[in-house]
Amino acid sequence: MDWTWRFLFVVAAATGVQSQVQLVQSGAEVKKPGSSVKVSCKASGGTFSSYAISWVRQAPGQGLEWMGGIIPIFGTANYAQKFQGRVTITADKSTSTAYMELSSLRSEDTAVYYCAR
């Protein structure tokens, strides 16, 4: 595989233990620079609409970085300034699923991406 033109985009599952909410994310993706990726986060075992869903990422050797979040009942997302214009976070209340789409991918976007409640 030509790693000059591709990089790994990984997502990982997170579990909300206190509220017994489980968040299950879509799998790992390999994308080319300049493309976009959309990952999902399906909630089960609790109320989806009333609580914020955040997206964070962790690049190799780095700490956690908050990208943005959404409260599904309101439908309006907030984004970290760093990602403004490149990230779109949405939620589908009917399927209890949140989505994060990141566009104009760069090599420095290689990271593990988490959804969290």
Curated annotation (Swiss-Prot):
Positions of the UniProt region annotated as Framework-1: 20-44
TM annotation in the entry: none
Cystine crosslinks: 41-115
Region listing for Framework-2, in residue ranges: 53-69
InterPro entries in UniProt: Ig-like_dom (IPR007110), Ig-like_dom_sf (IPR036179), Ig-like_fold (IPR013783), Ig_V-set (IPR013106), IgHV (IPR050199)
GO terms (BP aspect): immune response; immunoglobulin mediated immune response
Modified residues (Pyrrolidone carboxylic acid): 20
Molecular function via GO: antigen binding
KW Signal (keyword) present: yes
Compartment(s): Secreted; Cell membrane
Record-linked SUPFAM superfamilies: Immunoglobulin
Signal peptide: 1-19
Pfam short name (any one): V-set
GO cellular component: extracellular region; immunoglobulin complex; plasma membrane
Highest taxon, organism lineage: Eukaryota
Record key words, sorted: Adaptive immunity, Cell membrane, Disulfide bond, Immunity, Immunoglobulin, Immunoglobulin domain, Membrane, Pyrrolidone carboxylic acid, Secreted, Signal
Primary location class: secreted
Region (Complementarity-determining-3): 116-117
Region (Complementarity-determining-2): 70-77
Function: V region of the variable domain of immunoglobulin heavy chains that participates in the antigen recognition. Immunoglobulins, also known as antibodies, are membrane-bound or secreted glycoproteins produced by B lymphocytes. In the recognition phase of humoral immunity, the membrane-bound immunoglobulins serve as receptors which, upon binding of a specific antigen, trigger the clonal expansion and differentiation of B lymphocytes into immunoglobulins-secreting plasma cells.
Subunit structure: Immunoglobulins are composed of two identical heavy chains and two identical light chains; disulfide-linked.
UniProt name for this protein: Immunoglobulin heavy variable 1-69
Organism: Homo sapiens (Human)
Source species taxonomy: Eukaryota, Metazoa, Chordata, Craniata, Vertebrata
